[in-house]
Amino acid sequence: MLNQFPGQLSNNVFCFPPIESETKSGKKASWIICVQVMHHNTILPITDEMFSTDVKDAVAEIFTKFFVEEGAVRISKTTRVTEGKNLGKKNATTVVHQAFKDALSKYNRHARQKRGAHTNRGMIPPMLVKHFNIIPKTFFEDETDPIVQRKRNGVRAVACQQGDGSILLYSRTEKEFLGLDNIKKELKQLYLFIDVRVYLDGELYLHHKPLQWIAGQANAKVDSSELHFYVFDCFWSDQLQMPSNKRQQLLTNIFKQKEDLIFIHQVENFSIKDEDEALRLKTQFIKEGYEGAIVRNANGPYEPGYNNYHSPHLAKLKPLLDAEFILVDYTQGKKGKDLGAILWVCELPNKKRFVVTPKHLTYADRYALFQKLTPALFKKHLYGKELTVEYAELSPKTGIPLQARAVGFREPINVLEII
């Protein structure tokens, strides 16, 4: 859960990124908000488990640090969080989780206040999809039906209004799009009628155009005025817990305020009762020339993609591709249960390498393989073999297969017999 929040952990204290501004005298000022967990008089290490289970007698403390260059650091009094919220309900929070949510709310509020002249410009990374070709059962457990939308193969973009009234349009990686004047002009008109604090989340796209062409147009400094902005979600930095179905209702109201837009569109929503309906819609969308479908948990919050966090409240449905690639090495996962579990390394004809997760091996088998497979055994039995790989798509930048999973070797090989 820690990776859901911007910032880093140091000496058992989690600090959000500095929000910088400028004093009247022209000096650089920094404001930082931090969270620590106290057990009596001891600072505890913050772990992911604390977001789901309370530690007995532990309290969380929120405090801020403020300093001007060449000046002393001023530390605020701590705000203590002694219990979570919504106890006994599905959306209950622990002490630590609630403290982080409170701190994030204050962080976003402060960032928004400073967004005018001297700021990080209020960029919040958009929510990313976790589930691929799987719709969690939890999506159907609530009274509100999940939402399905067409998946366009375009370039992700988020729009917000700056403190000076200008429009900021930025990418998934928080890079500003400098062109797209046709879209920014309409956004400026739209923001005259709506809450200026709202972020519009969508995709830059033109139907039947390849992603590489779209990316080139999106990043061009000279505006071609061909791309359109398809908005599929909205959020407020201080109301990230607002459920998806309510955000969609507000998004519909936003577009009702100005119905003569040419380059900005609200994505159509479809409610579904079960997974079969979602799959039928996916098939329909693909026939229409789209990439597939996106499924949204109707009660899911907006979870920004800080530290490349992928939200479990989104699922992507699209056809799988497959191809054979040459196996050249092996490695292990880097964190969590993947640490110590074997991963294959394949190579493209241009010598670029990428990691592939074995699809049909259990974690126990993957642990055993990594422990017992030696470089000599790998070179003798596996090096240079063709591996059949399923993947979602090729990266438009590198050509590397994304979300790659190894189905098996082209020639029958039982890797467990090698060890």
Swiss-Prot record:
- Region annotated AD domain sits at 121-317
**Recorded superkingdom:** Viruses
Q: Which residues form the signal peptide?
A: none
- Is Nucleotide-binding among this UniProt entry's keywords? yes
Specify the enzyme's EC class, one word. ligase
Disulfide bonds, paired cysteine numbers: none
Q: Where in the cell is it found?
A: Virion
GO molecular function terms attached to this record: ATP binding; DNA ligase (ATP) activity
Q: Which Pfam families match?
A: DNA_ligase_A_M (PF01068)
Region of interest: OB domain: 318-419
Q: What is its main location?
A: virion
- Biological-process GO terms, alphabetical: cell division; DNA recombination; DNA repair; DNA replication
List the catalysed reactions: ATP + (deoxyribonucleotide)n-3'-hydroxyl + 5'-phospho-(deoxyribonucleotide)m = (deoxyribonucleotide)n+m + AMP + diphosphate
Could you say which EC number(s) this protein's record lists?
6.5.1.1
The UniProt entry, under InterPro entries, shows:
DNA_ligase_ATP-dep_cent (IPR012310), DNA_ligase_ATP-dep_CS (IPR016059), NA-bd_OB-fold (IPR012340), NAD_dep_DNA_ligaseB (IPR050326)
Q: Which GO terms describe its cellular component?
A: virion component
**Where is the segment annotated NTD?**
1-120
Keyword flag DNA damage: yes
For this UniProt record, the keywords arranged alphabetically read as follows:
ATP-binding, Cell cycle, Cell division, DNA damage, DNA recombination, DNA repair, DNA replication, Ligase, Nucleotide-binding, Virion
Quote the catalytic residue positions: 151
**PANTHER family for the chain:** DNA LIGASE, LIGASE, PUTATIVE-RELATED
Q: Which family does it belong to?
A: Belongs to the ATP-dependent DNA ligase family.
Function text? Very low-fidelity DNA ligase that seals nicks in double-stranded DNA during DNA repair. Together with the viral repair DNA polymerase X, fills the single nucleotide gaps generated by the AP endonuclease. It is not essential for viral replication and recombination. Displays a very low adenylation activity towards DNA with 3'-dideoxy- or 3'-amino-terminated nicks compared to regular nick DNA.
- Extra facts: Consistent with its intracellular location, ASFV encodes its own replicative DNA polymerase and three base excision repair enzymes: a class II AP endonuclease, the repair polymerase Pol X, and an ATP-dependent DNA ligase.
Per the record, the domain comment is: The N-terminus domain (NTD) plays a critical role in DNA-binding, catalytic complex assembly and catalysis.
* The protein's name in its UniProt record: DNA ligase
